[in-house]
């Protein structure tokens, strides 16, 4: 990971209209290998320091030590794909620092999550999980108004699970917290037409606009300018 390239990319995303930059030093793609805290910090530290004055910065990590250093460096949101399960110190850190927290649903871990995931009703199960994690976070002292929820599109879910979550996203609104959705370039898009990740812009736009229409509050995307334009046009059409 080249910090200079990451900083330049972050600055370009801000220029395109990004309001939050999510910085991570450990891949959470299916099959990704774990990275130790020292290496993770080496990757993200300079990037956060350079970008924190230009936009709101989120640190994508499940390690409390990495999150603490990132917050010291200027990040103000912790995006934890394990929903506070990965490190026993994470909940207390987030409570003590009074920062925003994103809690995401994931079955297993990035190395195992796509190994034949099975649900009875994926929406009901994801909703129950997020409700339980929200309760735990609040019980640990994290202010409820600082918590955002992410159903984890593509994390331990089949193509049909992802589509079902997007169709019924409105059912998660009853949890009472902002919803974060990330569909950008994900494999469920390619499963529709066989497109590689580099050719999934159309599917990213379609799924992002539909997610927003169903109640998503925050969209995590690679193609900020294009998705932003699509959202503005959709808003204009809908009045």
Where are these regions (language model features)?
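Active-site-adjacent loop and "lid" segments of alpha/beta metabolic enzymes
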Residues: 1-9, 28-56, 61-65, 71-72, ...
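Short strand-loop junctions, especially beta-strand C-caps/beta-turns
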Residues: 152-154
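Phosphate/pyrophosphate-binding loops at sites that engage ATP/ADP/AMP, CoA/4′-phosphopantetheine
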Residues: 14-15, 55, 133-146
């Amino acid at each position: 990971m080249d910090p200079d390239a990451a900083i330049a990319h972050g600055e370009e995303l801000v220029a395109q209209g990004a309001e939050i930059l999510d910085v991570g030093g450990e891949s959470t793609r299916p099959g990704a290998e774990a990275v130790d805290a020292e290496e993770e910090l080496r990757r993200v530290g300079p990037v956060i320091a350079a970008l924190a004055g230009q936009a709101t910065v989120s640190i994508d990590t499940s390690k409390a030590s990495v999150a603490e250093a990132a917050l010291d460096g200027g990040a103000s949101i912790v995006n934890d794909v394990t929903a506070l399960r990965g490190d026993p110190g994470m909940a207390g850190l987030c409570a003590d620092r009074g920062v925003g927290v994103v809690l995401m649903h994931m079955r297993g871990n990035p190395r195992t999550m796509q190994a034949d995931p099975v649900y009875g009703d994926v929406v009901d199960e994801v909703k129950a999980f997020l409700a339980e994690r929200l309760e735990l976070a609040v019980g640990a002292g994290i202010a409820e108004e600082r918590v955002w929820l992410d159903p984890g599109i593509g994390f331990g879910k089949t193509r049909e699970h992802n589509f079902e979550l997007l169709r019924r996203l409105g059912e998660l609104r009853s949890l009472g917290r902002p919803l974060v959705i990330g569909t950008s370039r994900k494999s469920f898009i390619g499963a529709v037409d066989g497109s590689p990740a580099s050719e999934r812009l159309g599917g990213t736009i379609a799924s992002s606009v539909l997610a927003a229409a169903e109640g998503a509050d925050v969209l995590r995307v690679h193609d900020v300018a294009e998705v932003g334009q699509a959202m503005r046009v959709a808003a204009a059409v809908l009045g």
